[in-house]
Amino acid sequence: MWIKIIDGEINKPKLVNLDYVSCIFPDDDGIHLVMSDGCVLISISKEYPYNKLCEILTKSSN
């Protein structure tokens, strides 16, 4: 599943494939999405808060 987040490092929209997200965790600067290749994206999207991302990832893994 693809979603559009606001990338906190460049402050611009970025498409992210949630199938490649290994884990997520909240931090002071946003929600960190650890990708399967080890890359870390920082989402500052108000549309996808931590709880909503957890819910989406749980549903997509089933």
Tell where the protein language model's regions lie, with residue ranges.
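Acidic, Ser/Thr- and proline-rich intrinsically disordered linker/docking segments
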Residues: 1-14, 20-62
